[in-house]
């Protein structure tokens, strides 16, 4: 029962109420198991709004609206608790507490003892007292039945009976709250026998005026004294004590006292009735701070809340936060008192409030689901046509918190200890009242009010960059093209896609590639197609080489053409709003460039390569390449080219029809073509017959200058009556062989090989692909490796893809310094129908640059050349190509002394084309009976490969998510001796056999040195876990993955973190990249935010690699 708070401290007798101090243990037992008073001398937070609710609950009526408001009274007061006294009402035995408070203007000015007491208040625990509580029944309150005590309670609380007596009985004495002694006779009798309190019980019931529904409790204190208390059921009182003021007077009294004390920093007294109050309104300061500023709230968040049950028990009920708003926005604005709206999971016998205060609940900050986290479940294949824009955790967060945008469900990468995303209570209330409209939904610009450490790094204008699981989560994959596009590119990509129906620009086609149609082999066109989606192509044309580069850059598409002297600079900028003009402009620009080339051609081939070209390639390296096509033609003499910038004005209007412009361009190109040897023509015929296009027609234009390269096999050709001359470089798919020493690099999707300038890294990045499902294109891409006099060779393998791209990488110089930074890479195609086909020359003189690089489109494996040799057990073959260039390069340094000296994945790249191929040439059978009748002459026998041949690749190179479901993966123990391949010009003999190499997988544990293990040594998960636990000294703690503790997870090729043991062992061996042992804290962080940021495997290599140096011999 509450009383008004006067301005003074008052006496201990409760200001005329006759209350007495009571036993502390009995007071807490009567108050309830959830009640806890802050210690004297500590800081507390006082809520006048809650105090007013207690008055209304005591009077069984709501607060009168006529009560005056006190605008100068804040919704909460931080005070020092000078004194606290536990009291009990002499009439009703209801317990309450009297507290003397004094407001504090500045918490930092409090002495250390006060702050320490506040901290201790949060940690203090009250010792559990043995007690027994029972709700009285009608028979218990009758005058003749006595009080029945449950057997276990009687044996635990009451003294032992003397069972030698018949019936067993004893006399009990118990003291009440007011230190009155009550005597009862305890007897064990009845049928069945039970413990009863008989004599003296009726006196106690009548004296306390107990009714059915009230509760009686017995406890034993620290002195083993038996204490007796009562709890009255909440019922409408028939009369009120004369000492109790009217409801309005009490409301005015407590508010006036609090306002006066806040204005003058004076002491005031309040009374707290735990049985009448709906919630505690005097909260320890540390508890308040932790609840309001330490918890991140979000709508839909789950929570627990403790409730008192019958007979003084407790139980947690689960609920969901449905809203955060002021309980009384008029009188108590921005108040934290019961400002959380909740919905409960289940019904309860007692009525539960729909509004609670934050310090009353326990937010569930770890996972939003009851069942095991999907982060650690086995991977399942995505259904066809389903977008992978969001991860499972993204979906869970969005469903749980639909009130915020996608950005807030992320984690700040710079903050390693970020907690569950959301806003704390103070931020919620500030946002609501800073908005012009009440109840306004959270706006993105307000999210920068996140508390704690993240607030220093968040920018409201760039939340998508600041708050994230991982950068790859922020990328939205375009469904049609399966390419990662930033949101700003989506609109531009749609506009660029409208340019397609017209013939395309010089050296560049902005086409959303789909599929290809069969092209008539008799209609050979000069075709260069390059899919560019929302990107910026830079077309560099040093004469006589043509370099077409595709760069991803916003906000506009710029076409730059570099030609020879005179240095004319004209920039052609393709405007998105003029799609119909772009094609005309580029075609016309192509004609003008060709005419300029014809005028300046004669003496260009003998000029020097300037530093400008080298510098320009260094700048190109800084951009994100989508596709680059490079081609050069070299005569026997050293070719060094002087580039000149020639550009076109994209805004030029042209009246020339697309078809006519194309024909003129083709005619202009014809005089520029050099003679091609018979071997090259044979190879050309062979390639264009092997490649069988099967997709929708697209219009393309080819710009060639002595040598042209294709970057896309999906083309349609315009009819022409021109007879193809022997000196023209052409192919149905655009696969064109240069007439002299050149490196051909074929890569999957849109990989790029930067050769000009020698400064580009060959790596695979996220690139456009025209299919989101395994390709049905049945075009096998045949790769021919042409030897080059350069000492540095490039090696790539490719297969049939939805977009096959051929990069003609020129060897610009013969005897100048070798290229230093071009990556040696093996590209693995993203299809289920064709496996890596052949090898090619790779340029790499810098073993420190080797590393493993994976992407969503292809997997590239870089082979280290640090030891000067590689070994791989691909069978040898007699695929000779050395004589291809014998006529065109009479002074070539190549001399075949041993077929194995020029092996590349078991392929003799210096052999003659006409000799039969070994059946094990290709990793995939691309030349079966399907193409037998299409190959001319003896070329039929050159491309027969067995379907049974599947080369042994690394078990960690490809996962099934790349669509290569039928490829066999074993160890990478290999035996290819490529010392002559790496040193071809030295004419040295083959090096000695090297030690066989094996795979290994790194295992990491925070705070311990990483270990490496051979996955193939183990037969199953149990053996693996036992060995890993032994290595790191955690034996027996990796067994049960469903309980909290150490977890063994691994990362696959898509960089997904999965639980070890969920997938079949064979699948695990194929796709594991690295293994990590998670501590319980790391597991919790993983469950909360789905990512470790930069702390999870930072810059770590994976299976079959060590910091970018694959296939290195290691041991445990």
Swiss-Prot record:
The keyword Nucleus applies. GO terms for cellular component: nucleus. Residues 132-234 bind DNA. Residues 768-780 have a biased composition (Low complexity). The keyword Nucleus applies. Residues 998-1082 form the PB1 domain. Keywords: Auxin signaling pathway, DNA-binding, Nucleus, Transcription, Transcription regulation. One of its GO terms (biological process) is regulation of DNA-templated transcription. It is found in: Nucleus. Disulfide bonds: none annotated. Its main location: nucleus. Residues 763-812 are annotated as: Disordered. It comes from the Eukaryota. One of its GO terms (molecular function) is DNA binding. Induction: By auxin under dark condition. Down-regulated by auxin under light condition. Expressed in roots, culms, leaves and young panicles. PANTHER family: AUXIN RESPONSE FACTOR 21 (PTHR31384:SF163), AUXIN RESPONSE FACTOR 4-RELATED (PTHR31384). Auxin response factors (ARFs) are transcriptional factors that bind specifically to the DNA sequence 5'-TGTCTC-3' found in the auxin-responsive promoter elements (AuxREs). Belongs to the ARF family. Homodimers and heterodimers. Interactions between auxin response factors (ARFs) and Aux/IAA proteins occur through their C-terminal dimerization domains III and IV. This is Auxin response factor 21. It comes from Oryza sativa subsp. japonica (Rice). The lineage of its organism: Eukaryota, Viridiplantae, Streptophyta, Embryophyta, Tracheophyta. The gene is ARF21.
């Amino acid at each position: 029962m509450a009383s008004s708070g006067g301005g003074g401290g008052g006496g201990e007798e409760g200001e005329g109420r006759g209350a007495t101090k009571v036993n502390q243990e009995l007071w807490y037992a009567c108050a309830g198991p959830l009640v806890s008073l802050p210690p004297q001398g500590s800081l507390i937070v006082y809520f006048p709004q809650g105090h007013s609710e207690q008055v209304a609950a005591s009077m069984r009526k709501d607060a009168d609206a006529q009560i005056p408001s006190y605008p100068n009274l804040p919704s909460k007061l931080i005070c020092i608790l000078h004194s606290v006294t536990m009291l009990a009402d002499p009439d009703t035995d209801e317990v309450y507490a009297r507290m003397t408070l004094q407001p504090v203007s500045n918490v930092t000015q409090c002495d250390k003892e006060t702050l320490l007491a506040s901290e201790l208040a949060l940690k203090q625990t009250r010792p559990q007292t043995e007690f027994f509580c029972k709700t009285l029944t009608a028979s218990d309150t009758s005058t003749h039945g006595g009080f029945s005590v449950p057997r276990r309670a009687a044996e635990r609380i009451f003294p032992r009976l003397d069972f030698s007596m018949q019936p067993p009985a004893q006399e009990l004495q118990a003291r009440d709250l007011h230190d009155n002694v009550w005597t009862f006779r305890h007897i064990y009798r009845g049928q069945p026998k039970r413990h009863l309190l008989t004599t003296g019980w009726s006196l106690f019931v009548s004296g306390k005026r107990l009714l059915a529904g009230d509760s009686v409790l017995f406890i034993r204190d620290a002195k083993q004294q038996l204490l007796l208390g009562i709890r009255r059921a909440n019922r409408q009182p028939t009369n009120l004590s004369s000492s109790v003021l009217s409801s309005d007077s009490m409301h005015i009294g407590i508010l006036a006292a609090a306002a006066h004390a806040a204005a003058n920093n004076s002491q005031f007294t309040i009374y707290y009735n735990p049985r009448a109050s709906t919630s505690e309104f005097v909260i320890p300061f540390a508890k308040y701070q932790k609840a309001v500023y330490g918890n991140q709230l979000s709508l839909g968040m789950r929570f627990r809340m403790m409730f008192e049950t019958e007979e003084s028990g407790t139980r947690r009920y689960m609920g969901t936060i449905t809203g955060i708003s002021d309980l009384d926005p008029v009188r108590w604005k921005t108040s934290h008192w019961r400002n959380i709206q909740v919905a409960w999971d289940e019904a309860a016998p007692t009525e539960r409030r729909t509004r609670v205060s934050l310090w009353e609940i326990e937010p569930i900050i770890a996972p939003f689901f009851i069942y095991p986290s999907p982060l650690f479940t086995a991977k399942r294949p995505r259904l066809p046509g389903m977008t992978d824009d969001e991860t499972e955790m993204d979906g869970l967060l969005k469903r749980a918190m639909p009130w915020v945008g996608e950005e807030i469900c992320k984690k700040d990468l710079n903050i390693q200890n970020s907690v569950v995303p959301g806003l704390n209570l103070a931020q919620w209330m500030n946002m609501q009242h800073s908005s012009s409209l009440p109840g306004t939904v959270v706006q993105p610009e307000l999210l920068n009010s996140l508390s704690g450490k993240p607030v220093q790094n968040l920018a409201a204008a760039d939340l998508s960059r600041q708050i994230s699981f991982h950068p790859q989560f922020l990328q939205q994959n375009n469904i049609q093209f399966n390419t990662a596009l930033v949101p700003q590119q989506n609109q531009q990509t749609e506009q660029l896609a409208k340019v397609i129906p017209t013939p395309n620009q010089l050296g560049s086609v902005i086409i959303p590639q789909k599929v290809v149609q069969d092209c008539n082999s008799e209609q050979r066109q000069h075709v260069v197609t390059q899919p560019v989606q929302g990107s910026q192509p830079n077309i560099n044309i040093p004469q006589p080489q043509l370099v077409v580069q595709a760069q991803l850059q916003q906000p506009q598409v710029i076409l730059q053409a570099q030609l020879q002297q005179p240095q004319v600079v004209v920039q052609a900028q393709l405007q998105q709003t003029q799609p119909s003009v772009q094609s005309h402009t580029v075609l016309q620009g192509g004609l003008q460039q060709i005419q300029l080339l014809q005028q300046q051609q004669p003496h260009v081939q003998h000029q020097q390569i300037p530093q400008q070209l080298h510098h320009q390639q260094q700048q190109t390296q800084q951009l994100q390449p989508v596709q680059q096509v490079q081609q050069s033609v070299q005569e026997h003499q050293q070719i060094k080219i002087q580039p000149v910038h020639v550009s076109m004005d994209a805004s030029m209007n042209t009246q020339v029809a697309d078809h006519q412009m194309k024909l003129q361009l083709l005619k202009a190109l014809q005089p520029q073509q050099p003679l091609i040897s018979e071997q090259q023509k044979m190879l050309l015929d062979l390639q264009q017959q092997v490649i069988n296009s099967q997709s929708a027609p697209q219009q393309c234009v080819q710009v060639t200058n002595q040598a042209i390269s294709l970057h896309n096999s999906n083309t349609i050709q315009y009819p022409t009556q021109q007879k193809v001359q022997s000196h023209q470089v052409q192919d149905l798919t655009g696969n064109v062989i240069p007439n002299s020493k050149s490196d051909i690099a074929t890569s999957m999707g849109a990989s790029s090989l930067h050769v000009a300038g020698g400064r580009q890294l060959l790596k695979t990045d996220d690139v456009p692909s025209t299919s989101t499902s395994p390709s049905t294109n049945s075009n096998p891409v045949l790769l021919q490796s042409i030897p080059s006099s350069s000492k540095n060779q490039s090696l790539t393998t490719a297969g049939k893809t939805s977009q096959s791209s051929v990069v003609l990488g020129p060897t610009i110089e013969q005897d100048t310094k070798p290229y230093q930074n071009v990556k040696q890479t093996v590209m693995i195609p993203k299809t289920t129908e064709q496996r890596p086909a052949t090898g090619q020359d790779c340029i790499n003189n810098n073993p420190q640059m080797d590393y493993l690089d994976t992407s969503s489109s292809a997997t590239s494996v870089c082979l280290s050349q640090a030891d000067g040799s590689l070994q791989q057990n691909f069978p040898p073959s007699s695929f000779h190509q050395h004589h291809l260039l014998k006529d065109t390069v009479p002074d070539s340094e190549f001399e075949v002394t041993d077929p194995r000296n020029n092996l590349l994945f078991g392929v003799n790249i210096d052999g003659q084309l006409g000799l039969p191929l070994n059946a094990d040439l290709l990793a995939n059978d691309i030349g079966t009976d399907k193409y037998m009748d299409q190959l001319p002459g003896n070329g039929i026998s050159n491309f027969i490969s067995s379907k049974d041949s599947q080369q042994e690749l690394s078990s960690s190179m490809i996962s099934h998510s790349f669509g290569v479901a039928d490829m066999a993966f074993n160890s990478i123990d290999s035996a290819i001796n490529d010392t002559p391949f790496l040193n071809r010009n030295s004419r040295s003999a083959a090096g000695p056999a090297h030690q066989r190499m094996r795979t290994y997988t790194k295992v990491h544990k925070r705070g311990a040195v990483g270990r490496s293990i051979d996955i193939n040594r183990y037969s199953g998960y149990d053996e693996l876990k036992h060995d890993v636990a032994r290595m790191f000294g955690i034996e027996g703690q990796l067994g049960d993955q469903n309980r909290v503790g150490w977890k063994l997870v691994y990362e696959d090729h898509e960089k997904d973190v999965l639980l070890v043991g969920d997938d079949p062992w064979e699948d695990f061996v194929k796709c594991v990249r690295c293994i990590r042992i998670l501590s319980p804290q790391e597991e919790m962080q993983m469950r909360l935010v789905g990512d470790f940021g930069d702390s999870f495997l930072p810059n770590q290599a994976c299976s079959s690699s060590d910091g970018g140096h694959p296939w290195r011999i290691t041991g445990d």
